[in-house]
Amino acid sequence: MKPDRGMRGNMSQAELMMMTVADVIKQLVEAHEQGKDVNLNKLKTKTSAKYGLSAQPRLVDIIAAVPPQYRKILVPKLKAKPIRTASGIAVVAVMCKPHRCPHINFTGNICVYCPGGPDSDFEYSTQSYTGYEPTSMRAIRARYDPYLQTRHRVEQLKQLGHNVDKVEFIVMGGTFMALPEDYRDFFIRNLHDALSGHTSNSVSEAVRYSERSNTKCVGITIETRPDYCLKRHLSDMLCYGCTRLEIGVQSVYEDVARDTNRGHTVKAVCESFHLSKDAGFKVVSHMMPDLPNMGLERDIEQFIEFFENPAFRPDGMKLYPTLVIRGTGLYELWKTGRYRSYSPSTLVDLVARILALVPPWTRVYRVQRDIPMPLVSSGVEHGNLRELALARMKDLGTECRDVRTREVGIQEIHHKVRPYQVELIRRDYVANGGWETFLSYEDPEQDILIGLLRLRKCSEESFRPELKGGVSIVRELHVYGSVVPISSRDPSKFQHQGFGMLLMEEAERIARDEHGSWKIAVISGVGTRNYYRKIGYELEGPYMVKRLD
């Protein structure tokens, strides 16, 4: 029924909006019962016009108004940005308070390309951020309070129709480990408390309650520098429940690291990778093509070196092409003509060639920074660089075989393909002084990845007492596909179908029969420890361990 003009005249905008939302839901239910596909944007536009509204109803309001009996059916279809939880986990990025970069003390300045920080043009921003990225703006709104940042983001994802049973934190905002210990403890304690609802007095208490929380913290990622990734830093991060490190590498060339004022050597990068992997961490590196004194050939050479040389070989990579932003040393070089960025098409070519080099055990998390385009004076001109690079790869006849491209959840969203014939595939390689085994369940015909496990035979130099004397460690276990609440089984989703258990059994066999290890350890997120307890593991220090004899 279309309301007549008289009726509309007597109604407030809020009442008309309520009727519009109810009408949209009614049409969605009818479409579902008739088995039809609906274009939500067209439906919203048409229904808003019918009620004489100038604005469309927000997706959050539509999701909130769905009746209980239709929630299971409609909410997954309405979900905004399904990629957010396609890998099986809701990622919550939080920022620590702004602080100066630690290497100012001995190099006299920050890196030449770094835009943010307390002394920069961008007030309230943290080091290496502008304050205008979505995460930065959420952090500033919450006045950098970790508890509020977490609660607000989890609520926001819930309202957008995402399942937030499993949360992974990313701690951003400069070198977290350079901050005072009491602030770091306060910050991590509040992250765990925001999920469990408990108010803790110490990190260990927060972690204990977080283990039993309904919303599980399945991992914490901390951004750091190679010189803040030493034994004491790694031990602290293990106590926090951290499972992954993002290490700023930027370049594998010593002269470029020196000229851009990084404040550490490339040797320090290799050492930090070695220590981190021997402690069980997953290592993600930040790399910056198009730095000063590079050039196209040298850029391609550095990525060949990065993936081929066993001293590097990270588990993941964030690719951040250099951006020129006002107030930086690089901006001065660019203004005086001493630095030139690649042209947009050259950059797309370069990224396409880099993605073709990525081995199947590495995950490319990002291909550009989240910095708003108006702040960029020179550098990336496209907001969808990964898509353009993948399209260029199609033209060149190459393909990207990194973990993210092949994930089952992402494949389903982008290409509507589902795995058919699933096999266990094993890849062995040497990295950072240790024997690495990458186990995965894949559909080799369609090249779709369902689950993966990273197993490492710890080297002799392992510094953790729990990992000394012939121990193997599982550094990652992840079954992809949309988030399934931890206690339920959904036959159409790939999480909780037993793939994780099969991967663990194979890892235990390799550790016992091939590595000759007497014990296997797992670096487990705080919220997933009970999963390992069920299969015979117990807590020893920060690790879940099991004897193999």
UniProtKB/Swiss-Prot annotation:
It catalyses: uridine(34) in tRNA + acetyl-CoA + S-adenosyl-L-methionine + H2O = 5-(carboxymethyl)uridine(34) in tRNA + 5'-deoxyadenosine + L-methionine + CoA + 2 H(+). It is found in: Cytoplasm; Nucleus. Residues 398-549 form the N-acetyltransferase domain. Its cofactor is [4Fe-4S] cluster. In the embryo, detected at the animal pole at stage 6.5. At stage 15, expressed at the anterior neural plate and its border. At late neurulation, most abundant in the cranial neural crest. At the tailbud stage, mainly expressed in the branchial arches and eyes. Its EC number is 2.3.1.311. SMART domains: Elp3. This is Elongator complex protein 3. It comes from Xenopus laevis. The gene is elp3.
